[in-house]
Amino acid sequence: MFKSGFVTIVGRPNVGKSTLLNYIMGEKLSIVSNKPQTTRNNIQTILTGEDYQIVFVDTPGIHKPKHKLGEYMVNSAKDSTNDVDLVLFLTNPDEEIGKGDKFILESLKDKKCPVYLVLNKIDESTPERVAKSLEMYSSEFNFKEIVPIAAIKGKNVDTLVDLMKTELPEGPKYYPEDMITDVPERFVVSEIVREKALRCLRDEVPHGIAVDIIQMKQSDNGTYHIEVDLICEKDSHKGIIIGKNGQMLKKIGETSRYELERFLRTKVNVKIWVKVRKEWRDNQNLLKELGYKKK
């Protein structure tokens, strides 16, 4: 009997949703950064076994939106909990239950599918904090399963996957077994570049960064030639991104190239230009051009 179903991962920004998904898949398919709100789109990722197929939906964190891009992200996260077979509510033990957590849990109360509490980052906490957190969340919601994990190290992740399999109904193979994501290669490439920019810039430039793939061609010898526009909101941000004597932009390019070669499994040449598009996060037309469709 073949089993298949859809699992969505929800939680506040920066609790480790993308890290968990990347560990399960063994591929960097979702952007990972130490900054919150780095995932901006729902990404369907497919895990296929001999007798099962799990389609994961990795979502943006749910937060109070401050601009049209934020509205898009929150609506994407809410929409992803409809018509799924299982919801994983991800959080970590070192933070109190906040308004964001309660907002998410309240939105899940009318769901017919089971909801798991997945307590991430237990390796960074203490047994006392973990126990207190489990008690707090259990008093807020009737979770079917509670699974403490350390996604970055893979601790208890296999146990979580085994539990997920038990929730799958009998069903078809929705995607070919060699397909691991429903997003095009260009999208993953843009997310890799955006992640590296966020990591290199740290707190120097806020989340007003987008990536537009201008060209992506593969030559006869297999080498990819990629040209990218890195879009920011202010002229001052452009200067920071380029850096003194172009050193910051060079660093972003080098770290991006390394990760792109791992993902594409071939040599990559990448060129990055920095462009200013003022208030692009509130520009509906530009958001659409960059792939953020209005919900």
Swiss-Prot record:
Q: Does the keyword ATP-binding apply?
A: no
CDD domains the UniProt entry points to: Era (cd04163), KH-II_Era (cd22534)
Q: Which compartment or compartments is the protein found in? A: Cytoplasm; Cell membrane
Q: How does it sit in the membrane?
A: Peripheral membrane protein
Span of domain KH type-2? 201-278
State the family it belongs to: Belongs to the TRAFAC class TrmE-Era-EngA-EngB-Septin-like GTPase superfamily. Era GTPase family.
Its recorded name reads GTPase Era
Which species is the source of this protein?
Answer: Clostridium botulinum (strain Eklund 17B / Type B)
